[in-house]
Amino acid sequence: MVNYPHNPIRQKVTPLQKQQKHKQVDFANRGMSFEASINATNAYYLAKGIAVIHKKPTPIQIVKVDYPRRSRAKIVEAYFKQASTTDYSGIYKGHYIDFEAKETRQKTAMPMKNFHAHQIEHMAAVLKQKGICFVLLHFATLKETYYLPAKALIDFYQIDRGNKSMPLDYIRKNGFEVKLGAFPQVPYLDIIEQKFLGGDYN
């Protein structure tokens, strides 16, 4: 027979969101990629009714299909095609959001070889239509993440068509650091709210 106490001691529990709000997130220690953390952030924004932003599916080129039965076609060979635009898009407070995400283990620069001409052209087209376009750059070794407006990326790319790396100093001068947290993990909408919709950014 189990005797249960009549007056159990109630412990004060701190809400998880409040408890971890300012805790720094280390993606490597958590076994999570930067992309996964952005996806988790977007899921948080969607669940809270803050924004609707999704990762665009990577296009696939089907090479060979097996038909063991008429009703069951099986793809046996395919490969990923190069994405023609950016990684993410959606809407926030009536504004179209479009951005790319890149990660590096380098400490002083972001390799520009990861950006392709068609992506730069797409970003320029988004800006022309008054959309909010940017890149999220994560320096894994430094544990630093930056929001770089698309215009700053385009300006640097046009110097030599993206043949050299973008110095971290340039990113710090022209971008904004994103303070990582728990809920959401990569709060990039804070930058948009404060610097763009708030009117601080020229």
Curated annotation (Swiss-Prot):
Its EC number is 3.1.21.10. InterPro entries: Resolv_RecU, Restrct_endonuc-II-like, tRNA_endonuc-like_dom_sf. Mg(2+) binds at residues 85, 87, 100, 119. Keywords: Cytoplasm, DNA damage, DNA recombination, DNA repair, Endonuclease, Hydrolase, Magnesium, Metal-binding, Nuclease. It catalyses: Endonucleolytic cleavage at a junction such as a reciprocal single-stranded crossover between two homologous DNA duplexes (Holliday junction). Binds 1 Mg(2+) ion per subunit. It is found in: Cytoplasm. Its main location: cytoplasm. SUPFAM superfamilies: Restriction endonuclease-like (SSF52980). This is Holliday junction resolvase RecU. The lineage of its organism: Bacteria, Bacillati, Bacillota, Bacilli, Lactobacillales. The gene is recU.
